[in-house]
Amino acid sequence: MESKYSGYMGRVVMYDLSTQTLTDYPWSDRERELFIGGKTMASKIMLDNFTGQEKPFSEENLIVITTGPLTGTGAPSSSRFNISTLSPQTLITTSSNCGGRFGWYLKKAGFDALILKGKCPEHSWLEINNDKFVMHNADDLWGLKTGETQEALQEKHKMPNGKLMKYGQLAIGPAGENQVLYASVISDERASGRGGVGAVFGWKNLKAITVRGNKTVPVKDPEKTKQWIIKWDKYIKSHPLTGNQLPRLGTAGLVSSMQMRGMLSSKNYNYGKYEHFDKVNGETLAEDFNIVNKGCLTCPMKCARTVEVNGKPVKGPELETLGLLGGGILNPNLADILKWNYEIDELGMDTISASSTLAYAMEANEKGLWKNGLEFGKTDNISQIWDDVAHRRGIGAELADGSKRLSEKYGGKEFAIHSKGMELAAYEPRRAVGQGLGYAVSNRGGCHLNGGYLVIVEGLGLYTNPLTHHAKADFTMLFQNLMETISASGQCLFTSYAFFPGFLITRPNGVITTIANKAIPFIGGVLRLINRVSPALALHLPVFHHTKIFSYALGMPMTFGKYIRTGERSYNVERLVNSKFGVNASWDTLPKRLTDTPQDPNNPKTKVPLETLKKTYYKARGWDQNGLPTKHTLRKLGLGEYC
Amino acid sequence: MINVELFGLFRLDTKIKGFELDPSAEGVSTVKDIYPILLKKAKEVNPATKICAKDIDGCIIIINGVQSKKSAHVNDGDKIQLMSPVCGG
Amino acid sequence: MSEEVKKDQEPQTEAPKKKVAAKKEEAPAEKPAAKPAAPKKPKDKPYIDMPTCVGCSVCIEACPMDCIQLSEPKFHGDIRTYAYLSDEKKCIGCGMCEKACPIDVITMCQPGEIPDKYTKGETSMCQDLFKVYCRVFQAVMKVGNYFMGYRMPDYIQGAGCIKQLPGIIKSKGLTKVLVVTDGGLLKLGVPDGLFEAMKEVGLEYEVFSNIIHNPTSDNVEEGYKLFRETGCQGLIAFGGGAPMDCAKAIAAKNAHPNKTVAQMQGLLKVHKKICPFWAVPTTSGTGSETTVAAVITDSATHHKASINDPSILPKYAVLDPELTIGLPPYVTAQTGMDALCHAVESYTNWTYCTALEKDLSKKAVRLIYDNLLTAYEDGKNFEARQNMQIAAFYAGRSFTRGCVGYVHAVGHTLGGLYGIAHGQAMSVILPHVMAQYGPAVYDKLADLADVCGMTGVTNEEKAKKFIAWIREMNEKMNIPKGFQQIKDEDIPQMITWAKAEANPLYPVPVIWGDDDFRRLIHTLQTAE
């Protein structure tokens, strides 16, 4: 349905892969106001279409690819899109965000979202050109790695004069084709990495999608939008985190800091430090390996690394991969990590789940639970392992199912480091208990970002007491809410880091910073109140530019309070749809290693007091003891129909 | 000897990974006493450097694994790490 | 032919040479001559405004020909990159980039032009307030100018009139003078006629020639020391702008021995009568013989700044065209364009000029239009040389009151940082600044175009023709289009210096902010 708001193309479509038919999916302005777009929109669509009986590998499972209304307006870091589906890894819904250009071009084709159902009768790739959908046979692409697939697609998108068309693309690799439970979808050099979305593509015989179009994203007030973009861009570029650390070190810059805080998980989360961290940290990457930093379309931060592997410039690793394939498996060789990161991307898998599953397997082998020949520190066979996993060959066939299923089969559940079936992301939560809560309650599983990313105040950016549970639940909720709306609007979560005034970062020893850090554990009550009365916060914060862009670019009134409330609604919609698949408090767990075994044997506080944190968190969220939204909460959020 | 290590952007800006110093020979009793030595080394590595004391103040100071201040005392055998605040995801 | 000393009058020129088109050979009567086809206008290309581009890459994505790229990062993690047209030949002028840009920093236009929207000067609340302040300052200065007593120097004019100078000096009661000149002129023997004449009348003299293109504060201190220690009573500045400015600064130093050069730089910091001072220009020229400015580079900081004070305006000038006959072509070109720059900047500036200065600017422009190329191609052409000398004189007098502008402010920074000769800097920068002023100068440039007989329907057209003529002159005289040696790391300093010099004193047509200076400097770096 056409929208009164700008930014939206006004069309959501459902494409049946079985019958190759296209229908319009109704989406109203009221829904745009409540759910914005992106992952939230996808959750709402899944909430309205899933009964809870669906299986991930089924025709009834939907692949929901959504964009945000800011994509195409030129707002900073606004080219992100989302793929949501029922995850084969967790058996609940998952959302997987990506910085590739697919979403940008989906909007140029005239669509805010694309919903896929059914199953292609043969190996296929889908070509979308404005509103023309053409399914092609993909036998010539099947089996190709993601890079090879994208190169082959280029040949299919050349004009008669030899020039390449401009289009966006999605592709899976052999891992998706073979339904590795954590297979990813690649778009250009970026990945929709987590949750096994690539496996669903593979089961549905969908190898790739390309999309192009010639439509323009409407902007409500071009002049005000332009001035705001210029101002915001300047702010991001001058901020110490977004304008200095992220471009120059990337997320890889966290390794040393995590080491210092005891948050760098090593040997499968046995420890929080790695003695050779300096060989695999962001500084070494920057000094010895980084060629240039790159950015997603419209992004001023340009945080991605480019490194050389086999003489070719390729995407470099993010922090999680460095941590998990470095200290995580006791590997001190950075060049290996760069190579493996590339190989895993080429095969089309989630680097986090792949690495963490490998680490589990190494520990299971070490403990005699599973004889698989994999050992910590033994790295000469790892490239072959990845290939075996992607092709479900030998032990690869088992590793392809992830650490949860392996631990159910072989034992060692206490050191299968996952939550809800999705592996955790290198931050050791026993030294950042708020992050531990986040991992456990994250809607899609062990996700650090969906979990609120509390490490940023627990030692990496600011350094409040990482072991206390006070205020952590309320902070988690606040950060989660903000980040939900950022994602829903099509922007990158990293734009939120400039929320912390620069002087708090550049003056870590300053009086105000010291006071702020000491005060954080005591302001839980204040945060609870903010969360509760958020719509009353009808203001704009100078450090949070995200609200004004809504009125300028979209013509949709937005305030800081409303932004938080929208995020809260988003989080609850995801919880609701997952509850159809059985999610409740018993799913919000962490492995016993993290909740029962102190990281420091001499300090009993160095473990995650999860039950205490969960209790407070559910209260803050307005959920019952079973971890489900109460009727009051649902009505408050405009979700009364789901009571 | 005191072992001083640099991390984060501060390491990239100074181009110094770390160094050792003899506290008694260099007259170092607090972290702040290390500042001129560090700035001098940074100047030796890159004469055009604009690094100054303010940049060292911008680092998190960790002595033997515990966060500290520049007024903290340091002793022979201590390990001092200077780290710029970071974020990621 | 020499003449009596003229007081405060305009020098006489040779009859202006009318440009007469060569007669075409008459075509055979039966066939009327075919009209030459109007030159095809080149395709519009994207102008990408570098200072305001945020480097979002949307235009790169939109371009179907892949002819836009992001600039090279200057270091690992550099995020201040910007889009630029990397392959002009590949560009088909489709305008997709302009349509795609979310912040309107791309506009299709004719190559080399700057679209009007980027010529209005930086706008923000602070900048707008600053502009008001500048205009108020300049309005007050305009009133103050009426009390300044600007005048033409007393002068003698004509071939060989330099030989009269020693007698005139002696008649004023002086027995010893310091001749400030440059080593190059000495080697060539250009001042020999003056020296012989001084010996003939028994006028003692010392020579100070340790001056480079852009005189430094050290040069001034050294020259002053010689002046004082040898008991000189007056100064003869013999040469181009460098010896002129150096001599003026020596005279200022002599009036204030305890002040440093830096302390006298700026506005009205001399305000004391100087010793007798004769200016003998050998280039055409800086017009320094008529100006109240002396531009000196600080030896320590390399900052080039001007001593501006009516006290240092030379009392006397000697306009002997024979002294310019031997000027090499490149010096003729650069100094000639320097004179043009004075005339144009003074004319296009706001409010300071009276009808006299405007008239002098127009006359100067016309003389340069008619004579510079001839003087460049045939240095021995006496009329061309004389007329260029007069043009420089007029232009100098014009800008003494009318002031200069951003061409000078930015040009001085290049002199300070890279030792680029003043004349060359002016020649290169002038057309770019005029283009970047946009509509603000159309009317005035159209006046100058009219003076030169250029035709056009609108003022915009005439103005652009005038700017095109400046570019054409540069090309014909082998003056480069830009300065690729400008280093990015020097740009902040250049902007600071240029702003300090120009704002609020220079009544420029458009008051610029940092982004505007960056725009100009980027143009200079990338012009080919």
Summary of predicted features, one role per range:
Chain B
Residues M1-G88:
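Ubiquitin-like/PB1-type beta-grasp interaction modules and other compact soluble beta-rich domains
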